[in-house]
Amino acid sequence: MGDVMLRLFTEEDHKHKGKLVYEWLLETGRELGIPGGSAFRALAGYGHHGRMHEDTFFELAGKLPVEVMFAARADQVDALLATIAAEGLHLFYIRTPAETGMTGA
């Protein structure tokens, strides 16, 4: 069983069960035993719809992409993706094999 890098994408103002989606993802990952996760807010981006979202457009406040990233065992990522699907969330994701380690170890 190898390690996996999972990257999920949402918008900064999207909510699920009253929480921001990226917060819900991080909390759910922690509850499933994933050792760490991070959320990153984009400076600009576009998705399947093709509309550009940039920090400079006032009318797009809250619409910037957020990436939530986890490095975990494959079974942990499988459990997270199954939980996301069971909750009815529709998120684009990228799953890739990963080699993990610690420097100086």
Question: Where do the protein language model's features map onto the residues?
Answer:
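Positively charged, small/polar-rich N-terminal and surface patches that mediate targeting and assembly
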Residues: 1-105
